[in-house]
A protein has these predicted regions:
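Short, exposed coil/turn segments at beta-strand boundaries within extracellular/luminal domains
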Residues: 125-126, 225-230
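Short proline/glycine-enriched turn/loop motifs at strand-loop junctions of beta-rich domains
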Residues: 61-64, 176-182
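Accessory carbohydrate-recognition regions in carbohydrate-active enzymes
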Residues: 166-170, 177-181, 204-222, 232-278
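Contiguous beta-strand segments within globular domains
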Residues: 31-41, 45-55, 155-174
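Short, aromatic- and glycine-rich surface loops/edge beta-strands on solvent-exposed regions
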Residues: 115-120, 184, 216-226
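Short, compositionally biased P/S/T/A/G/V-rich stretches that sit at domain boundaries
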Residues: 132-164
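Beta-strand-rich ligand-recognition modules
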Residues: 1, 5-7, 15-49, 57-142, ...
Length: 278
């Protein structure tokens, strides 16, 4: 959900299932399913010091138990709540018990550019939303959204790779596609270092910056269809060389081999069967 672009009537769920809810995907053959709701917003300016508060007002929650985790950029807080009425799940709020989750934080935890709030139900059952508020200083100003893409984050990678026989340190461009097939361009100190057509959903691109032998500051610019959407200073530094094994991430499905891989003890090679690593 992107503030200023998405519609709460069509793009935000009124209810979020927990892992105890089979209608949310949990089952003995499909495993334990948790769900996340992401709220993206762009900040054009903010004070260095100040306090904010995120308020999540719930109509009700599962009468047994729900553990809700709220993440704001890199900080998080967990809430364990217990609701009252099962009927709230189907829209009958006569016996509902309101739950208000408050998350105070500093403006230092926000950043100019892309920010994200993630709401997750880690344990227990469903929650039903009423409203979500972010209170803070009037000097925190929302920025305008680009029509085609939302830039989540720009950061130097903590590794180097090889490109055409030369070492490079990637500049990680975390971008969310919104509309059309826009051209993404990245400049470093005024020179184009990366270009790609955006397609669907979220992508993290590696824009290759020439490797350095000592720390060095450079200016980066990110453009979409030749429109500047972010610029800033990046600190380049020497890093270790990344291997293919370092890209393994169990959170996105990379894990151990399944039992059906063959040939193997359960199906010797003499039986002439080759199976994919499923």
């Amino acid at each position: 959900f992107l503030i200023g672009t998405s519609s709460d009537k069509t793009d935000f769920p009124y209810v979020m299932p927990g892992p105890d809810d089979t209608w949310g995907g949990t089952w003995r053959t499909s495993g334990w399913r948790t769900h996340d709701t992401n709220i993206l917003f762009n900040i054009s300016q903010k004070p260095k010091n100040g306090q904010c508060k995120l308020i999540i007002d719930l109509v009700d929650s599962n009468p047994n138990r729900s553990v809700v985790k709220v993440t704001i950029n890199s900080i998080e807080k967990k809430f364990e709540i217990k609701g009252h009425s099962e009927e709230a799940l189907e829209g009958n709020v006569q016996n509902a018990k309101e739950q208000i989750l408050e998350f105070p934080f500093s403006t230092a935890d926000l950043k100019e550019g892309g920010n994200i709030v993630t709401i997750s139900v880690l344990e227990g059952g469903w929650i039903v939303f009423d409203q979500i508020l972010l209170e803070g200083s009037d000097r925190v100003t929302l920025g305008d959204n680009n029509k085609y893409a939302f830039l989540r984050n720009v950061a130097p990678a903590a590794y180097e790779t090889e490109l055409e026989g030369k070492r490079v340190q990637p500049l990680l461009i975390d971008v969310e596609h919104l509309n059309g097939t826009p051209q993404l361009t990245v400049k470093l100190d005024g020179t184009d270092i990366f270009a790609a057509k955006l397609d669907t959903s979220r992508s993290i691109f590696e824009a290759p910056m020439p490797a350095v032998k000592k720390n060095r500051k450079s200016m980066y610019q990110v453009l979409v269809n030749n429109e500047l959407i972010e610029k800033g200073i990046v600190l380049r530094s020497p890093q270790a060389l990344q291997t293919l094994a370092d890209y393994v991430d169990t959170k996105i499905g990379t894990a151990h081999s399944r039992w059906m891989i063959a040939p193997g003890p359960w199906m010797p090679f003499s039986m002439v069967k080759l199976s994919p690593d499923n």
